[in-house]
């Protein structure tokens, strides 16, 4: 709505603006012929016109006697009036129309909800489901490959067999010398209360179960087994000391070498013969 202060004088106001303001003045005959602008559509509803008014050309506008009369009365206001008319039209165009905005807003959601047709939407959903199923199939195939039993190497098979055979790890039992076994039996027979199973196990650093089996066993080796065992242990003794001699280790001298039977029996004769 235009402000009254910005309006020109009533003589310079055209018919269109007067119809907006509701002012109806008697117009001259020449004014009907040379009208400034065509009537507004809103005004045509209230005051229908018999014919559609066309805007005046520049030549007709300059030769109109009524307009010349108004220009002579107000020489400085024609430019202002034309500028105010243009500004009023621009303001009317720039004013937001609530009906038009509501129509636009009501139509936009429908467009946004269904931006694509049924065919494109079906294709989109189909491609999306295909991608999802393809990803699931790929993941399933990877999991199947991981779950499938792989071919083991020979060393892996041996390792699994050892783990199954020795779940607690490699812990071989301590093997005692046959003479030691005889000593254990002899001590237990001499004094069972003193040389008990826990005491003997702690003394020889074996388990009580091993001492119990040694005492329970009544097996005695034959002469042939004793001779074979003695040879085997002598070979083992020589092999070990030969390996130590190669790296520069000398054999340890026994603490009781001076009290051996040979020295006691034949030591005096050797000393006497030597003198």
From Swiss-Prot:
Record key words, sorted: Mitochondrion, Transit peptide
Biased composition (Basic and acidic residues): 89-103, 141-150
One Pfam family hit: Neugrin
Chief location: mitochondrion
Localization annotation: Mitochondrion
Coiled coil: none
Transit sequence range: 1-42
InterPro entries: NGRN/Rrg9 (IPR010487)
Regions of compositional bias (Polar residues) in chain numbering: 77-88
Region (Disordered): 71-154
GO CC entries: mitochondrion; nucleus
Job description of the protein: Required for respiratory activity and maintenance and expression of the mitochondrial genome.
Family: Belongs to the RRG9 family.
Protein name: Required for respiratory growth protein 9, mitochondrial
Taxonomic placement: Eukaryota, Fungi, Dikarya, Ascomycota, Pezizomycotina
């Amino acid at each position: 709505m235009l402000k009254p202060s910005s309006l020109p004088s009533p003589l310079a106001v055209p018919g269109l603006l007067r119809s907006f303001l509701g002012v109806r003045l008697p117009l001259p005959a020449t004014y009907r012929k040379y009208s400034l602008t065509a009537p507004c559509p809103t005004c045509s509803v209230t005051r229908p016109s018999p014919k559609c008014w066309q805007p005046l050309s520049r030549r007709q506008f300059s030769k109109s006697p009524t307009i010349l009369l108004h220009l002579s009365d107000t020489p400085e206001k024609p430019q202002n009036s034309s500028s105010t008319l243009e500004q009023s039209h621009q303001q009317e165009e720039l004013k937001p129309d609530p009906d038009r905005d509501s129509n636009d807003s009501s139509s936009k959601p429908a467009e946004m909800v269904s931006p694509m047709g049924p065919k494109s939407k079906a294709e989109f959903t189909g491609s999306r489901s295909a991608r999802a199923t393809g990803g699931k199939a790929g993941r399933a195939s990877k999991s199947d490959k991981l779950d499938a039993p792989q071919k083991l190497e020979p060393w892996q098979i041996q390792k699994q067999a050892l783990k199954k055979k020795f779940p607690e790890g490699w812990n071989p039992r301590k093997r005692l010398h046959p003479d030691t076994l005889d000593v254990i039996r002899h001590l237990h027979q001499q004094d069972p209360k003193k040389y008990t199973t826990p005491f003997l196990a702690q003394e020889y650093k074996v388990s009580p179960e091993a001492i119990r089996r040694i005492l329970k066993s009544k097996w005695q080796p034959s002469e042939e087994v004793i001779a074979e065992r003695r040879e085997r242990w002598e070979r083992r003794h020589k092999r070990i000391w030969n390996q130590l001699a190669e790296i520069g280790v000398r054999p340890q001298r026994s603490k009781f070498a001076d009290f051996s039977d040979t020295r006691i029996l034949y030591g005096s004769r050797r000393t006497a013969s030597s003198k």
